[in-house]
Amino acid sequence: MWIRARSTPAEAVTGLCRRVVLLLCSLALWARPGEAQRPLTVQGTRSLTFGSLLSGVNKSVLRSDAINGGQLDISGPKSVQVLLTFTLPASMTGPVGATLPLSFGSTDGGWSPPQQVGTQIAFDPRLPFTAPLDQNGKVSVYLGGTAKPTANQKAGSYTGTITLTVVVLP
């Protein structure tokens, strides 16, 4: 069964999975006494999107996918380390409470200097990870994953929430 993703509520419900929405929460900022610090900001640049899926056929999105891979841009104090902790869902929720299983592997997370998707360094998004902010106080974080629709997956749009907690380390 071919299933197509729905882009807007006005379109006919013929889709299965649209996207996992990247939401940001729990930002903490460490500051040295007596020093002015740039505030820590996180911008969700691109949501992790699975698009059209076939029932019973897994679909992986690479973290390096410049269209469908998730991207967050972090700004803060110059040349410091930040602790990144993702809260990843086991599934997305769709029509009438239907769920669509997700999985995230050991190389589905990546980081690089800002906006340099091609020079990412992989990390396991299931585990806390330390990444450096560059001399300008910036880093980009990327996320891929796998949607695992069942053979009898209910058609419709599915969404989920991914939370990234960022802490500036002393």
Regions found by a protein language model. Name each.
Residues P101, S106-T107, A122-D124, T159-G160:
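Structured interface patches
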